[in-house]
């Protein structure tokens, strides 16, 4: 959290707006379990000391005159990791945080950021390092009308030596997880959860520790793709590009650092395209396109339920 940029939004507040009509039925007052609503000068008034923010008055008001205001970052956080510091600014409890990035994309003031590696990546390219981009299959939803061949050409113009799709790693991950499943379920564990999403696996292990052993030990598609490429390019530096900030957490792990050197989000990649004034409409297809080496199920990892469908 960038403290000086935080707007100190109210954590949770139920408030009567100017739309209150002062109706005679007083439904908001009738449904309040704490008798926190009174009427002053013909308008509804909420005693914040008594209000428990249950929202019953919000849903009952026929004029939608009562609103429930919540801090956007805290509302988006699914694990309750956002709290307030002594000055009322947002603060992250890293014992609960799973680095999913939901607070980051929901803060209207841009006060929550993740650690970027654009500078380090550009310096590596300028030094002449062989930098290979491995791109998540979700790129088709991030860049309209972008074909794999056009993406390879665009990445080449940024200075990348080559570009591969992480879907091939998803295929390898499916094989490993299927092997784990056949070996361990139900003989050792009642079920098995996928390991492909670091935010999910961290959340499961933090909040459901008794089921931690039920998470597959298979490497993620990102790591498996990086390992595959380094077999033929041992000196190459690997840059993962995807939609999720949680991959930055994964890449910081000691066991992954030797495999993946940089992580960019699609937003950061788009910033690089704009800085280099790369127009997708004007791009020719890369004639050496060998991007499509994965299965349809591997690309389906980017769809909700895709991992399970690939393993089924």
Predicted regions and their residues:
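Iron-sulfur-associated redox domains of electron-transfer enzymes in respiratory
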Residues: 1, 114-312
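Ferredoxin-type iron-sulfur electron-transfer modules and their immediate structural context
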Residues: 1-60, 64-76
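Gly-rich Lys/Arg/Thr-decorated short loops/hinges at beta-loop-alpha junctions or inter-strand turns
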Residues: 7-15, 38-43, 84, 102, ...
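Immediate flanking context of iron-sulfur cluster ligation sites
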Residues: 11-15, 95-97, 233-241
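Transmembrane alpha-helical segments of multi-pass membrane transport proteins and ion-pumping complexes
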Residues: 22, 26-31, 60, 106, ...
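Surface-exposed charge patches
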Residues: 30, 75, 105, 153-157, ...
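Glycine-rich, histidine-containing beta strand-loop boundary motifs that form or position
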Residues: 32, 41-43, 65, 70, ...
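Conserved Radical SAM active-site core
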Residues: 47-48, 53, 63, 72-132, ...
């Amino acid at each position: 959290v960038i403290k000086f940029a935080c707007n100190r939004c109210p954590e949770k507040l139920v408030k009567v707006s100017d739309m209150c009509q002062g109706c005679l039925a007083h439904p908001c007052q009738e449904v309040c379990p704490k008798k926190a609503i009174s009427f002053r000068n013909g308008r509804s008034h909420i005693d914040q000391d008594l209000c428990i923010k249950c929202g019953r008055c919000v849903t009952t008001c026929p004029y939608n005159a009562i609103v429930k205001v919540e801090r956007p970052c805290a509302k988006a956080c699914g694990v309750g990791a956002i709290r307030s510091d002594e000055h009322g600014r947002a603060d992250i409890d890293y014992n609960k945080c799973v680095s999913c990035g939901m607070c980051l994309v929901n803060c209207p003031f841009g006060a929550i950021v993740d650690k970027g590696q654009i500078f380090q990546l550009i310096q590596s390219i300028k030094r002449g390092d062989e930098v290979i981009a491995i791109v998540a299959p979700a790129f088709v939803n991030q860049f309209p009308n972008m074909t794999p061949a056009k993406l390879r050409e665009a990445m080449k113009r940024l200075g990348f030596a080559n570009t591969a799709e992480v879907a091939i790693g998803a295929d390898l991950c499916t094989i490993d997880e299927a092997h784990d499943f056949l070996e361990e379920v139900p003989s050792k564990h009642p079920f098995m959860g996928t390991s492909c999403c670091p935010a999910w696996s961290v959340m499961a292990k933090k909040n459901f520790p008794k089921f931690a052993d039920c998470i597959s030990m298979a490497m993620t598609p990102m790591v498996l793709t990086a390992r595959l490429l380094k077999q033929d390019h041992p000196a190459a530096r690997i840059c993962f590009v995807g939609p999720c900030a949680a991959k930055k957490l994964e890449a910081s792990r000691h066991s992954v650092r030797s495999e993946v050197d940089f992580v960019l989000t699609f937003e950061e990649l788009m910033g690089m395209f704009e800085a280099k004034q790369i127009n997708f409409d004007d791009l020719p297809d890369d004639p050496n396109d060998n991007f499509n080496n994965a299965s349809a199920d591997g690309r389906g990892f980017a769809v909700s339920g895709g991992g399970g469908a690939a393993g089924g």
